Amino acid sequence: MSKDDLIQFTGTVLELLPNATFRVKLENDHVIIAHTSGRMRKNRIRILLGDKVMVEMTPYDLTKGRVIHRH
């Protein structure tokens, strides 16, 4: 799957879960589980409750995603 197939949404962090995982409410009111991308882990970018984040999702599973940017 290429990067062109990925869907990007903006959302807000609702809950912090273990292992760098978050419950995120998207702009279209869907709630998903998202984990931190490897580049954000490597650079130790912290994500806190209430942060606006950019989430990347695959069209095959719309319940999970990857946090790629923090606003």
From Swiss-Prot:
GO MF annotation, one: translation initiation factor activity
One CC-aspect GO term: cytosol
Localization (cell): Cytoplasm
The S1-like domain, residue ranges: 1-71
Keyword annotations: Cytoplasm, Initiation factor, Protein biosynthesis, RNA-binding, rRNA-binding
Annotated TM spans: none
Gene3D superfamilies given in the database record: Nucleic acid-binding proteins
Keyword hit for Ribonucleoprotein: no
Membership in a protein family: Belongs to the IF-1 family.
Primary role: One of the essential components for the initiation of protein synthesis. Stabilizes the binding of IF-2 and IF-3 on the 30S subunit to which N-formylmethionyl-tRNA(fMet) subsequently binds. Helps modulate mRNA selection, yielding the 30S pre-initiation complex (PIC). Upon addition of the 50S ribosomal subunit IF-1, IF-2 and IF-3 are released leaving the mature 70S translation initiation complex.
Quaternary organization: Component of the 30S ribosomal translation pre-initiation complex which assembles on the 30S ribosome in the order IF-2 and IF-3, IF-1 and N-formylmethionyl-tRNA(fMet); mRNA recruitment can occur at any time during PIC assembly.
Family annotation (PANTHER family): TRANSLATION INITIATION FACTOR IF-1, CHLOROPLASTIC
Protein name, per record: Translation initiation factor IF-1
Lineage of the species this protein comes from: Bacteria, Pseudomonadati, Pseudomonadota, Alphaproteobacteria, Rickettsiales
Gene that encodes the chain: infA
